[in-house]
């Protein structure tokens, strides 16, 4: 139930909130805001995917979901499980610009 609420929140942010913010920034010619909202939108998509994967695993196994280390890009917020990538696929940040949560 909590995971579904989190997924719903992420989907709202993806489909409504950041999409609207990004379009408004484009219309106003705000390049910095466009980049920030682009990064936020991309990060929210990864968050939604992680929540959906976790919910599917939990629904099918009825057990706690083991997670490896979580890596978060300090520049754009892109999030992934496992090893730190050489560079962020969203913003190109180098691996030393990631935070690890184990």
Regions found by a protein language model. Give the residues of each.
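Non-heme di-metal
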Residues: 1-102
């Amino acid at each position: 139930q909590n995971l579904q609420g989190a997924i719903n929140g992420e989907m709202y942010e993806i489909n409504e909130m950041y999409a609207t913010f990004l379009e408004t920034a484009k219309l106003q010619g705000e390049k910095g805001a466009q980049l920030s909202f682009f990064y936020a939108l991309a990060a929210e998509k990864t968050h939604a995917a992680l929540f959906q994967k976790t919910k599917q695993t939990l629904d099918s196994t009825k057990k706690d979901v083991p997670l490896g280390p979580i890596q978060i890009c300090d520049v754009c917020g892109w999030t992934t499980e496992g090893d730190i990538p050489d560079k962020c696929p969203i913003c190109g940040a180098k691996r030393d610009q990631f935070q690890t949560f184990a």
